[in-house]
Amino acid sequence: MPDSFAFLADKIFTGESWLTQHAVIIEEDKIKEVVPAASVPDDIEKKNYPGGILAPAFIDLQIYGAYGKLLAVYPEADSLYKLNDYCRSGGAVYCMPTVATNATEVFHQCIDAIRDYWNKGGEGVLGLHVEGPWINAVKKGAHIESFIHSPSLQEVKDLVNYGKEVIKIITLAPEVCSKEAIEYIIGQGIVVSAGHSNATYKQANTGFSYGIPMATHLYNAMSPLQHREPGLLGAVLDSDKVKASIIPDGHHADFAAVRIAKQVMKERLFVITDAVTETNSGYYQHLKVGDKYESMGILSGSALTMNKAVQNLVKYCNVEAGEALRMCSLYPAQVMNMDKSFGRIKTGYKADIVVLNENFDLIKII
């Protein structure tokens, strides 16, 4: 097998611009160069995808489980293999398994499951997204209220230390967590996201001043923008730095609301699927209703894949195709400080590339 391959398609989106009549030359697992198709050396094996689009592969920073295995209910490596398979079915080669508000022992079990998955050679899983329990019960959504509380600094340290190098994101409500707790988490290299929060505009901005760089699922489970109290939503929209995830499935937010947020936030807005799976045991029991999930009648998760999110953004939200692709690749990579090696088709970057058709259906992951 040759060491290098040239991949050709009708269009290439590099993460920065669109190219036609070009090829991506890959050597081992890195992008060697992007060149005009006519200049590909004859001794390099060519793989052509007529009618296809080459684009940076996607990354999903919030997904709870797949194929009947919710991680919080089945905290084991098999759940992560299924979750990763689901992500790849929509073009996401990296994902952040997520556990909602729960007992400490469940968080520990999920941390252990990820370590076991990695030890077995499992790929794609970046770490754990801990969503709660340090949130505001007023904005609990489908979270279990009995576990929700304001943490002591010692509790924060204990969980973070147990999850060292595994916990990568923590969603919390800034108004229920101390400055010391927030700064400690950030100091351990974990991304803190404001979510499930009833913060006032002032409280939200105070949290941002402590270093909180983003918010979780914009619009959902957060204090809304009102003309006399702009809330967390208003603080995010008003910021020029704070990023936010959004779920473009048409259920978590109307497509017009997604479009408005995009017009205001531009490159600060990125996609998550927030995908769950059906389960009838444990604290979180999700029932699929159409193309969404509910728990006791409350919207509790999506049935999105990342490529479906791209389709929705382009079709319903008036987002340009390249920008929709960036929202699923480059921008989440930036959140995780991965954008020096992921999110672009560029010399030296990892060869994590999706092949899509003109409707953004997944053909292949390279």
Please report, for each region that a protein language model flagged, where it lies by residue:
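Active-site core of metal-dependent hydrolases
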Residues: 157-279
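Conserved, mostly hydrophobic/aromatic
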Residues: 130, 185, 215, 313, ...
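Active-site gating loops and adjacent loop-to-helix segments of metal-dependent hydrolytic enzymes
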Residues: 64, 85-96, 136-164, 208-218, ...
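N-terminal metal-binding scaffold of metallo-dependent hydrolase/deaminase domains
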Residues: 1-40, 365
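His/Asp/Glu-enriched, well-ordered alpha-helical/loop segment
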Residues: 235-244, 262-349, 353-356
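Divalent metal-dependent hydrolysis catalytic cores, especially in the metallo-beta-lactamase
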Residues: 63-68, 81-110, 123-136, 163-175, ...
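Active-site mouth loops of central-metabolism enzymes
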Residues: 65-77, 144-149, 191-195
